[in-house]
Amino acid sequence: MVEMGAMANQSQDCWLTRVQKMEKILNVPILAGPSRSSGKTLLADLEPKFEQFWRMKLTEEKIGPDNINHNKLRTYSTLKKSFSQEPYLGLVQNRTQRMHITRLRISAHNLNIEWGRYKGLAIANRVCKYCQNETNIDDELHFLNKCKTFLTSRNCFYGKFSSIDPTFKFLSENQKFERLLNPKTSQETRLTNKFIKIMFDWREKIDQGFSITNLGIYFAV
């Protein structure tokens, strides 16, 4: 804690400086002293403030020189409807059977839409290298719903998902995207998570030199 205090005094990024930043943003009140009710009092004061801050960050527009919103939460904001835990997190206790859904929801992945950010590429240049002779932006929607390279596997996945929810096939692409990343049952959660994992594994195999025509041998939804 002493070392962290020294880092904070030098304005270095650490846990303590982040706590201090949130303390300032949320205007955390100074309590008279610890008591049985102080925790409840502080929680009652901070919860609505944090929710307001969270909603502001979720919808914040960060317009760049290209007139495009560069908010990293752009995908998450289309999926997150309330300040509460998502149901799918409680439907499947095994973290590995839902982690890929979470990664795609919060943009914690290696799709070019994110890799390009760190390389300083314009969004228009963050294209999908797995599409043949096309210039599609390699974002979450394209990856999950549109990339033609994985059309056969996706159609198989869609068929299995539709057997669980027959209304799925009538949805638009954007609606399907939101539906898949907001699964309602444990079966939907595991199926979608498995497909996303397969897609990432598939892309990795292509990077290693495997032919797309032979990948069906290694992966099945």
Set out the residue ranges of the language-model regions.
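Extended C-terminal regions of large enzymes
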Residues: 1-112, 219-220
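Family-specific functional microsites
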Residues: 63-64, 68-221
